[in-house]
């Protein structure tokens, strides 16, 4: 009998796949447990439609992430800091501070998705990599300038 998996099943397949299984396995275990349903022509058509709709949603989401990447890469974040000897700032600029600054500008980026190439301890220009998901990474320019006064 042909079935459509409603959940991932070990040693059989993943959710949404169509498989041929023994009648007893399908009727006595998979269907009663809610792991599968009988694969009728209508059910298979419905499954394909759902998969196409999901693929369109994923493509649209990925396109939004690409646009976000472009916006972030066109931006420069500037921090002012008190400076001591040798242009060394007091403290460091952290990923949390970067995330807050991006949030103030309307971007919802988690600090754990921001990776600094090096610790920001001196006045100057730095870059940070931001993992946006879907295998897309944005590079953010960061500038640290001395506090005036």
From Swiss-Prot:
The keyword Plastid does not apply. It comes from the Bacteria. Pfam families: Ribosomal_L9_C, Ribosomal_L9_N. GO terms for cellular component: ribonucleoprotein complex; ribosome. The keyword Ribosomal protein applies. Signal peptide: none annotated. Keywords: Ribonucleoprotein, Ribosomal protein, RNA-binding, rRNA-binding. GO terms for molecular function: rRNA binding; structural constituent of ribosome. One of its GO terms (biological process) is translation. PROSITE patterns: RIBOSOMAL_L9 (PS00651). Coiled coil: none annotated. Belongs to the bacterial ribosomal protein bL9 family. Binds to the 23S rRNA. This is Large ribosomal subunit protein bL9. It comes from Salinibacter ruber (strain DSM 13855 / M31). The gene is rplI.
């Amino acid at each position: 009998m042909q079935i459509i998996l409603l959940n991932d099943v070990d040693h059989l397949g993943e959710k949404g796949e169509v498989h041929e299984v023994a009648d007893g396995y399908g009727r006595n275990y998979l269907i009663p447990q809610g792991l599968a349903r009988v694969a009728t022509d209508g059910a298979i058509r419905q499954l394909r439609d759902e998969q196409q709709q999901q693929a369109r949603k994923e493509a649209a989401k990925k396109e939004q992430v690409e646009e976000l990447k472009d916006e972030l890469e066109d931006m420069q974040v500037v921090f002012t800091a008190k400076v001591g000897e040798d242009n060394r700032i007091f403290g460091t600029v952290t990923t949390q501070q970067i995330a807050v600054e991006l949030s103030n500008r309307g971007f919802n980026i988690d600090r754990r998705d921001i990776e600094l190439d090096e610790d920001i301890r001196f006045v100057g220009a730095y870059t940070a990599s931001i993992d946006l998901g879907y295998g897309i990474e944005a590079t953010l320019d960061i500038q640290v300038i001395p506090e005036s006064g």
